């Protein structure tokens, strides 16, 4: 059993499972169990990537505040990383999010701002537009998962090579 001193070291190297009890036709089907990441999803990987790449560029340093607009697990991945690295985190969420997700974000140290879920892009209360505005008003870093090239970089540099290694290079 591995013993870790930092929860971020536990992100990645998630197991692969071959599906054998349902008909997969002529194919062998494998599942990558990203739920085994400490935050419970693949979004832990992008949280690390987006924050660490911003650090490398000098865009942020511990003590700064990061803002993100999210309707999914990205907020939890960012909260995990921000808490470990000493960043403030503000998450802007549509009001339809579950109370459990909101509770978890707050428990991980994030400030949660709820906004309307019944409006679209261009409306002042649309979650992505509001997230950008909150970052500007607070002088914080808007991480912008939807337009951030460090989001897919997590998979180009981490997830994909990990799959190739776990499969012994035998992919089609």
Name each model-derived stretch.
Residues 1-172:
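PLP-dependent amino-acid enzyme catalytic core
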């Amino acid at each position: 059993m591995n013993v870790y001193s930092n929860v971020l070291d536990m992100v990645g190297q998630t197991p692969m499972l071959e599906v054998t009890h349902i008909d997969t036709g002529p194919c062998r089907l494998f599942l990558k169990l990203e739920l085994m990441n400490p935050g419970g999803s693949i979004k832990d990987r992008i949280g690390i990537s987006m924050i660490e790449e911003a650090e490398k560029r000098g865009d942020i340093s511990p003590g700064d505040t990061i803002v993100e607009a999210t309707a999914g697990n990205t907020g939890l991945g960012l909260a995990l990383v921000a808490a470990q690295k000493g960043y403030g985190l503000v998450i802007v969420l549509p009001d339809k999010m579950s109370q459990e997700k909101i509770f978890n974000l707050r428990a991980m140290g994030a400030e949660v701002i709820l906004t309307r879920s019944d409006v679209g892009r261009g409306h002042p209360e649309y979650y992505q537009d509001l997230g950008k505005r909150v970052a500007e008003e607070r002088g914080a870093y808007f991480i912008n998962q939807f337009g951030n090239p460090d989001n897919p970089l997590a998979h180009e540099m981490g997830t994909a090579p990990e799959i190739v290694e776990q499969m012994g290079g035998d992919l089609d």
